[in-house]
Amino acid sequence: MIRHLLPALLALLPLPAVAAPMLITADRVWDGEAMHTGWQVLVDDGRIVAVGPNLAAPADAQRVALPGQTLLPGFIEGHSHLLLHPYDKVSWDDQVLKESEAYRVARAVVHAKATLLAGFTTVRDLGTEGAGNADVGLKRAINEGHVPGPRMIIAT
């Protein structure tokens, strides 16, 4: 669970994330099993390398204080359709029958970033509803770092 903390932590910071080491201190850290006070999270090269109390950080580490905050592991969304927009905004028929695949992908990029910033580090995306294999391309773009988004488990 600890490896899923990073994307949730990064959601609190301005994008893009810095590659320099980062020592993050919050009031509490939930590691997926227990709540801890006085713990820190050390991130290096985009990866969590240590979690615990009184961590030794490199001299050049950026120090991020998050008073009053609780750090959590990333959430997993078990049923998503990143290539669909809410039906109260655009009907299913209009999206699937009238919108271009390119337009739907552009909107899915926005949905992917919003999902990540909400703390969801993994989504199980259950199909594109008429956008072919666009979810495969979106997953690849996220994995290669072209766009921010959660890890995608796709069902195409």
Q: Where in this protein do the model-derived segments appear?
A:
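Metal-coordinating catalytic core of metallo-dependent amide/deamination hydrolases
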Residues: 145-156
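Bacterial N-terminal signal peptides
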Residues: 4-16
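Boundary at the C-terminal end of the N-terminal hydrophobic targeting segment
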Residues: 17-21
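Divalent metal-coordination and catalytic microenvironments
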Residues: 27, 41, 46, 68, ...
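Histidine-rich, glycine-flanked metal-binding segment
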Residues: 33-72, 142
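General beta-strand structural signal in soluble alpha/beta enzymes
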Residues: 64, 124-125, 154
